């Protein structure tokens, strides 16, 4: 079972916007050393929207090669074209990924039936564990609990990243699906409470900069130690908030650069963190102990 702290890994670029393979390897090693339970490559935080298909597949392969089977690698393969999502999922499988993360189709705004047919088609086309990803704040496309329930019965679909931050929604999803269907948080600030409701982990932005703390938080929540999990979460809360001071992954890439882990690189239309945001984020990093 894929569970625990799953980092939504950034994709490092150099100042010219080229992929930085050395920094990517360094980040993977950092997470292996710091207790991260799984790595999500080329998701939203990994700037999948500004990678071309060849780069997308290269990043997956590089992460898989660096991990060497020590923890699961989940590849982001979602698209708003079902055909493209199938092709990316096939490529991820051939590249050695352990599972795929598939976002709801954005921009074209399918109906609930359209979403069901989209995900069912991908699951039937490619035999690899697949995780649904619901993040309506980015996609303007909200997969309702009843659609998740239908999809939970489709072979190869093993779980969902529920990134609404709505705990009542998460509770309903958990109650509707079978015990073997994995419900993950996609919202750091509410992840503890979702796991205490029965969720199986957190696909985390915060884990990029505080992997050990996030791993400890998830372990405590999943064993039912609410006091310990909430204490860690209270300590991390300034970071949860500051990492969204501008659009993700702008702040988290700046934070990793500040920690000396990646160069200053991001691809348009995203831009480097605004100077007015530097000190608030730096202060949050110091409060949570990730920066001296």
Swiss-Prot record:
Pyruvate binds at residues 45, 203. Coiled coil: none annotated. Optimum temperature is 37 degrees Celsius. The activity decreases slowly when temperatures are reduced from 37 degrees Celsius while the drop in activity is relatively more rapid when temperatures are raised above 37 degrees Celsius. In this case, the activity reduces to almost 30% at 52 degrees Celsius. GO terms for cellular component: cytosol. It comes from Pseudomonas aeruginosa (strain ATCC 15692 / DSM 22644 / CIP 104116 / JCM 14847 / LMG 12228 / 1C / PRS 101 / PAO1). It is an enzyme of class 4 (lyase). Optimum pH is 8.0. At pH 9.0 or above, only 30% activity is observed. Pathway: Amino-acid biosynthesis; L-lysine biosynthesis via DAP pathway; (S)-tetrahydrodipicolinate from L-aspartate: step 3/4. Homodimer. The active site is at 133 (proton donor/acceptor), 161 (schiff-base intermediate with substrate). Belongs to the DapA family. It catalyses: L-aspartate 4-semialdehyde + pyruvate = (2S,4S)-4-hydroxy-2,3,4,5-tetrahydrodipicolinate + H2O + H(+). SMART domains: DHDPS. This is 4-hydroxy-tetrahydrodipicolinate synthase. The record marks 44, 107 as: Part of a proton relay during catalysis. GO terms for biological process: diaminopimelate biosynthetic process; lysine biosynthetic process via diaminopimelate. Keywords: Amino-acid biosynthesis, Cytoplasm, Diaminopimelate biosynthesis, Lyase, Lysine biosynthesis, Schiff base. HAMAP family: DapA. Its EC number is 4.3.3.7. InterPro entries: Aldolase_TIM, DapA, DapA-like, Schiff_base-form_aldolases_AS, Schiff_base-form_aldolases_CS. Its main location: cytoplasm. GO terms for molecular function: 4-hydroxy-tetrahydrodipicolinate synthase activity. It is found in: Cytoplasm. Catalyzes the condensation of (S)-aspartate-beta-semialdehyde [(S)-ASA] and pyruvate to 4-hydroxy-tetrahydrodipicolinate (HTPA). Gene3D superfamilies: Aldolase class I (3.20.20.70).
């Amino acid at each position: 079972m894929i569970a625990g702290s799953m980092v939504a890994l950034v994709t490092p670029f150099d100042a010219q916007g080229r992929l930085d393979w050395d920094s990517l390897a360094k980040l993977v090693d950092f997470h292996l050393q710091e207790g991260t339970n799984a790595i999500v490559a080329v998701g939203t935080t990994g700037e999948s929207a500004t990678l071309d298909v060849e780069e997308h597949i290269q990043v997956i392969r590089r992460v898989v090669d660096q991990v060497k089977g020590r923890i699961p690698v989940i590849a982001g393969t979602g698209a708003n074209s079902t055909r493209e999502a199938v092709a990316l999922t096939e490529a991820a499988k051939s590249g050695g990924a352990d599972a795929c993360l598939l976002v709801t189709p954005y921009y074209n705004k399918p109906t609930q039936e359209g979403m069901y047919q989209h995900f069912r088609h991908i699951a039937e086309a490619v035999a690899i564990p697949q995780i649904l990803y619901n993040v309506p704040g980015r996609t303007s496309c909200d997969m309702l609990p009843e659609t998740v329930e239908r999809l939970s019965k489709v072979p190869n679909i093993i779980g969902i990243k529920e990134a609404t931050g709505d705990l009542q929604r998460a509770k309903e999803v958990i109650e509707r699906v079978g015990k073997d269907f994995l419900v993950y948080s996609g919202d750091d600030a509410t992840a503890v409470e979702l796991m205490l409701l029965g969720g199986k982990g957190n696909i985390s932005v915060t884990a990029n900069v505080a992997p050990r703390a996030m791993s400890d938080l998830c372990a405590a929540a999943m064993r039912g130690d609410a006091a310990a999990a909430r204490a860690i979460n209270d300590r991390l809360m300034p970071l949860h908030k500051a990492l969204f001071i501008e659009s993700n992954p702008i702040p988290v890439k700046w934070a990793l650069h500040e920690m000396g882990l990646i160069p200053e690189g991001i691809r348009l239309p995203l831009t480097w963190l605004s100077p007015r945001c530097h000190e608030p984020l730096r202060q949050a990093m110091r409060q949570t102990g990730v920066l001296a």
